[in-house]
Amino acid sequence: EADRMMEALDWIIWEMTDEETRSACGAGYKAFYRHDTGYPSNDFFKALDPRMEHFIEEKMDAPIKSIGETAGYLCESMARQLGLLAGTPVGTGIIDAHSSLPGCGIGEPGEMMIIVGTSSCHMVLSETEAGIPGVGGLVKDGIMPGYFGYEAGQCCVGDHFAWFVDNCVPESYAQEAREKGISVHQLLTDRLKDYKAGQSGLLALDWFNGVRSPLMDFNLNGMIMGMNL
């Protein structure tokens, strides 16, 4: 039985400060937290499983900190490990993809950033809140303080490519990549760079992990059409 449930980013901050807090980013995008109403009600969790009725107060309840806010101060034990001064301010944690916006200088509305990795995250800041079908993430102060952070995208991108390379590429391609000293991914990219859209005759629907935007249905499946021998 778990004593506490939290995102890794909150655990790291807890270890550094010896104070348990929760990031508005992690709580909002991953645990349904809203700035005005908090977490879902006990009835919501009870409907999932009667044993979860008091899940929030028993496993997750802690002060919520906005991005850019001081979460606490470096504790003595961690200061010794890191060679830093105890009492050094420690910022609130942020999810990896979401940190890309301030890291790339996007600090106000009007610009969208697409972060592509295992999944793809399409993120944009706004001064206003609006429920938009197909946009699964909307958190106040979740990316930059003072703004609503919108998140859409797809839940299967890099892992889709990895699956294809591991399961659908002939050994001759793998051998060629080894001889050239490049990855199979790079070999496929080189072979396809002069192809026009649709030239191969293949059609692919990239819902192999379901679809995030715009349908928000993780029970849907992907497919590849047009293959022959």
Please tell me what each predicted stretch does.
Residues 26:
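Dinucleotide-binding Rossmann-like beta1-alpha1 core, especially the glycine-rich loop
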Residues 1-22, 30-55, 68-229:
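Active-site core segments that coordinate phosphate-bearing ligands/cofactors
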Residues 58-59:
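Long, well-ordered, tryptophan-enriched scaffold segments
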